[in-house]
Amino acid sequence: MTMKNVLDQGYVRLVNHMGSDLTVANAARVSYAKESTELTEKDLRLIRFLAREGHTSPFRHAVLQFEVYAPLMVARQWWKYVVGSSHMEGTGDSLEAWNESSRRYITEEPVFYVPKSDEWRSKPENSKQGSGEILPNETGTKLTKELQDYIEEGLEKYEAALEDGLCAEQARLFLPAYGMYVRWYWTASLQSVCHFLNQRLKHDAQKEIQLYAKAILELSKPLYSSAVTELVEE
C-alpha cells in the first residue's frame, strides 16, 4: 500500500523510503563498531531502549518521502510542525525538505475542499481554538452551499483576471485560499515523521490534519513497525 485517500479529494502517497528498523539499531551500534545483518529480538530491545531514553539520533538515519495533496489550511499547520529532525549540529539545516506547487507557475484548474453538510463543527465552549460538536444538518447544508457559491465567484474572478492578461502570481489573489488544495513533497527523517504524528494524532488537533496524520501512520508503520510503535503515542 503506497497511497491513502483523505477528505473529499486529498491523498497521501508514499513516494520513497530508506532504511528499516534494522537501520535504527545499526546506527546506534556503530558507536561500538558493531552491526547486525538481520533484525533480532536484541535489536528490538535496543530500539525500545533508544525511544524510552530519548536517544533519537539513530532514528534520523531512516528517511521517508511523501507526496501530499491537502487544503492550504492543512499544509500551513503541517509546516509549523516540520521540526522533529532539527538538531542544528553546526549546519543550521533542519535536515528536511518541503517542495510545494506554486500558482506563480501553474494555472491548472483549482480544486477546493468543501465539507459536506454533516461535517461542519461548532465552536468549542471553553477554548479559543479547536471545534465542538457537529452542527445541525440544516445549518450544515446552508454553509456548504454558501462556501460553494463563494468558491465559484472567486474562480470566475480568477479566470477573468487571467483572460485580461494578469500574471498568474497576482491572479491567484482572487482565489479563496484556505480550502484550496495544494500539492507538496515532504522528505523527512523517521524521527521527524513520528514527531509530526505525536503532535497531530492528538484528539485536540484539527480534525482535517488528524485524518492526514492517520494516513501517514498507516503508510509508515508497516515499514518501521518497531520504531513507530515505540516513538508514536497512539
PLM feature spans:
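Family-specific signature for flavin-dependent thymidylate synthase
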Residues: M1-E234
